[in-house]
């Protein structure tokens, strides 16, 4: 994609050419599982990720576009490029089932390592106007069960899903005055999805399109939405922020027999509030609140129990994964230890999106972790360059099924669990 000269002067376009080339390269890469709050990433940008994803009222690097585009007004001109190693551990247990061979432990770790790139660029083009571009993985989910959990009821080969979401977000911010800034980002979204080993659900009466439930290769979808942001300095040392992102329409045609509304898979609306307090020149405390509206997307929010009342997979109000809306609270601290070194730490907690009676289908998407702890640093190399690193640990969480397996599948319960370790590094250059 290109940015219109209406927004950027010719010298700025010249400076953007390497960024636009990187856009094309990054768009061609796989953007696999990348999630801690349901299937949304817990933050964007290495500096934010080191402080539990806090960013709405604490702009630190150019990836703030993904959280609050108003924040680019405080960054000047800079380029940030990062790479994350995401290592989830996901598994399931089936117990108390009456079908021979169904009970047991199943590992979804057929693929263990996921490399996730990100890129952000901002440029101040006028005293009150800044523009930018961010390329990042919004989220995703991956499971690969070499031993198919549904094998005893007709599943063939290995089982699992892979969901990838890449956002390309050009943005602009405008300073209304010294205290208040507004920002907007256009979210251009590309999604990819595949599923395999789900033959038990590819039956007449269970699916409206049984041939489009499983093993259809990779299906793609593109859509667009918008993110709005506000950043305000209300008192010395205090900043508040607010952000809202629209729903992005999506549909996986090859899996129109799996997802409700004929393959519909929208990215849900979400919004958030943030606050930061620079307690001293060295210490900053910050917090974010985020609300993700998973239940508004039928393929994600509708319960599997709709199968029992005519809501077959793929139908207009078909069965889904039964996810609930969630609230996320993020807390963090940044300490500028010296002119060279800044240290960060943070903690976040999210509601549980998966109810205990919805665990059977969520063997495929066990996004159950709720709490994670983070630490990070930035080392300033010189007046222009800096290196950032971070680590995040999502604590192990198990959701035990209660009334989770229908009698038609032999009854009993499915338990799902996950934990995550995340490592990242980024390089930033200030112009």
Where in the sequence are the language-model features?
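Transmembrane beta-strand segments of Gram-negative outer membrane beta-barrel proteins
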Residues: 39-55, 73-91
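Charge-dense polyanion-binding interfaces
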Residues: 80-83, 87-103, 108
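Outer-membrane beta-barrel pore proteins
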Residues: 56-58, 63-77, 121-126
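Active-site/binding-pocket entry motifs
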Residues: 57, 86-88, 248, 395
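Cleavable N-terminal signal peptides
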Residues: 22-23, 33
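Sec/Tat signal peptide C-region and signal peptidase I cleavage site
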Residues: 29-35
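Outer-membrane beta-barrel porins/channels
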Residues: 36-49, 94, 100-101, 106, ...
């Amino acid at each position: 994609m290109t940015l219109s000269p209406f927004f950027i002067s010719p010298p700025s376009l010249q400076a953007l050419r390497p960024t636009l080339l990187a856009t094309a390269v990054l768009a061609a890469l796989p953007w696999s599982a990348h999630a801690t709050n349901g299937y949304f990433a817990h933050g964007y940008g290495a500096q934010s990720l080191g402080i539990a994803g806090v960013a709405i009222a604490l702009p630190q690097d150019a990836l703030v576009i993904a959280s609050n585009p108003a924040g680019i007004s405080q960054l000047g001109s800079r380029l940030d490029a990062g790479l994350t190693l995401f290592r989830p551990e996901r598994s399931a247990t089936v117990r108390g089932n009456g079908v021979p061979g169904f009970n047991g432990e199943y590992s979804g770790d057929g693929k263990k390592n996921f490399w996730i790139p990100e890129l952000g660029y901002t440029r101040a083009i006028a005293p009150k106007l800044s523009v930018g571009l961010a390329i990042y993985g919004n989220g995703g989910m991956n499971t690969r069960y070499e031993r198919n959990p549904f094998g005893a009821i007709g599943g063939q080969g290995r089982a699992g899903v892979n969901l990838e979401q890449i956002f390309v977000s050009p943005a602009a911010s405008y300073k209304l005055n010294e205290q208040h800034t507004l920002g907007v980002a256009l979210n251009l979204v590309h999604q990819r999805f595949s599923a395999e080993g789900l033959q038990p659900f590819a039956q007449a009466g269970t699916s409206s399109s049984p041939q489009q439930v499983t093993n259809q290769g990779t299906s793609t979808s593109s859509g667009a939405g918008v993110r709005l942001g506000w950043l305000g300095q209300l008192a010395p040392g205090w900043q508040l922020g607010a952000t809202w992102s629209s729903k992005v329409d999506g549909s996986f045609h090859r899996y129109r027999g799996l997802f409700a509304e004929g393959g519909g898979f929208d990215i849900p609306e979400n919004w958030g509030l943030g606050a930061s307090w620079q307690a001293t020149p060295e210490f900053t405390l910050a917090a974010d609140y985020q609300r993700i509206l998973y239940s508004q997307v039928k393929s994600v929010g509708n319960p599997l129990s709709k199968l029992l009342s005519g809501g077959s997979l793929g139908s207009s109000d078909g069965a889904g994964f039964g996810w609930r809306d969630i609230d996320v609270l993020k807390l963090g601290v940044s300490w500028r230890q010296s002119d060279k070194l800044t240290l960060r730490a943070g903690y976040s907690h999210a509601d549980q999106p998966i109810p205990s009676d919805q665990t059977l289908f969520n063997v495929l998407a066990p996004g159950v972790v709720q709490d994670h702890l983070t630490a990070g640093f930035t080392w300033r190399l010189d007046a222009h360059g800096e290196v950032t690193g971070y680590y995040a640990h999502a604590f192990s969480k198990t959701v035990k099924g209660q009334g989770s397996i229908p009698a038609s599948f032999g009854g009993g319960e499915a338990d799902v669990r996950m934990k995550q370790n995340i490592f990242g590094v980024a390089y930033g250059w200030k112009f």
